[in-house]
Amino acid sequence: MSALKLQSLWSVTAPPGPLCSPLTGAQRAQAAVIGAGYTGLSAALHLAEAGREVVVVEAAEIGERASGLNGGQVIPGVKPDPDTLERLLGPYTGGRLVATTGAGPDLVFELIARHGIECEAKRAGWLQPATSEAALEQLARRVVQWLRRGAAVSLLSRSEVLQLTGSAIYCGGLLDRRGGTVQPLAYLRGLAQAVLRTGGRIHTHSPALRLARRTGAWSIDTPQGSVSAPVVIIATDAYTDSISEELRRTMVPVPSFQVATAPIPAELRSTILPEGQAASDTWHLLRYFRLDAGGRLVLGSRGTFSQSPQLRDVQYHYHAVHEIYPQLKGIPFEYHWGGLVAMTQDQLPHLHEPAPGLLAGLGYNGRGVAMATVMGRLLARRALGAQVAELGFPVSPVVPVPFHALSGIGARATIQYLRFVDGLARVGGRLRAHVPFRA
């Protein structure tokens, strides 16, 4: 434990980001964005490309929060299956949402190519290895639904999953060839560079302290300045604070932790995810894992409710790595870090319009690389005057999570319970608890 670096692997391996200064004085713009994560920078980039003068204010450095700390998995779609979405939202609205979110990786990799972003981008696909026969049956239904919609998705046998993952613990799985991986911080910094090259302005260390409507425009106050604009986009996701209490109460921030091994020797590395896919398994507290460009295994899962590394989180993640890949027991771990994931009640991201000229996008439920990039484009299109019917994504009312003040306690208890349920299943070989699988 003494040699464990309490820092993100991505902060060590990403190219430097742009140098930005705090906001000072009174500025004006045609659009202002709060938050320089994937959502905010995607929105700013699309606005700047449309010729709008845009200012982004960021509370910290670019990438210090979720967009620079995640696993870098570019996953198509949202968690509910396509048929479920069409049943809940209707065939038209649900169908358009399925199409919009399913194409998320297309947008990510198109932006990377168009702006020359160096971020170790690899589009080898995304795997869902099944941890039980029941989970495999659900994956089979998911495959059928996506195939009906023309997606490049296939069901895998036990031997095929073994070949693609190098792990013998799974009984089959799903391969979605639309997905891929990026170095998440490098991708974010590349988006920031693209915003600046396109004429946008980004101010770091400029937390939004106050947001108010004044003389026909929105005004954002920061410690050393202010910016006013007719349109403001709130893009703070799980880190939304008092700038919008009503938005903060629509989601529950849940910690996610990751560990990274030292570079794996070549003879071992060739047997682990040999084709370069990312994977997220089907445990209730799913484990997501991938290799980085340096040959390190990166694995993450839900953590305890603390943003500081906890011994039990470290031990849980070490055990998970060795359960999936027992051949790595001699490989040291070099990095450990965590961040917050915004979870919503319906497991869907939300596009909100709390007031005229005020927009927000949040709640990616662990699929933020692709979905937040898409949300940024949707918010930009709405800010540019697109009608809601043109977006291909519904605008949701702002509805708080019931008993939000207690949601952290409930989520903490749920995480501990699901760890217990998954542990029983691993010991007993089958899951008997009545808990719905929604990986």
Question: Over which residues does each language-model region extend?
Answer:
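N-terminal Rossmann-like FAD-binding beta1-loop-alpha1 element of flavoenzymes
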Residues: 27-56
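Helical element adjacent to the flavin cofactor pocket in flavoenzyme catalytic cores
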Residues: 137-145, 149, 168-230
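C-terminal catalytic lobe of FAD-dependent flavoproteins
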Residues: 307-423
